[in-house]
Amino acid sequence: MKKNSREVAAEIIYHWIESESFPDRQLAEVKDDRAFVTELVYGIVRRKLALEYIEQKFIPRRPEDFILAALHVGVYQLCFMDNVEEFAAVHET
């Protein structure tokens, strides 16, 4: 089954969280919807501290890394991407 763009971005972010290696190599392998995935990944990298600040207001302790990656994808879309509808950010992530 084909992964959606948000799932691909979450996997790349998960790898970045786990390995601390910059995600450019994984982004180079993305074929479908590359611009959207790139915006998500680089935006999350750029706004990591802001995302963590927002998330810690609602989550008392740090979730597991794969959940944190998905959370970053959803929160980034809701807070920093004007061209993404809220229902899409929540439902698809």
Regions found by a protein language model. Give the residues of each.
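Class I Rossmann-like S-adenosyl-L-methionine
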Residues: M1-T93
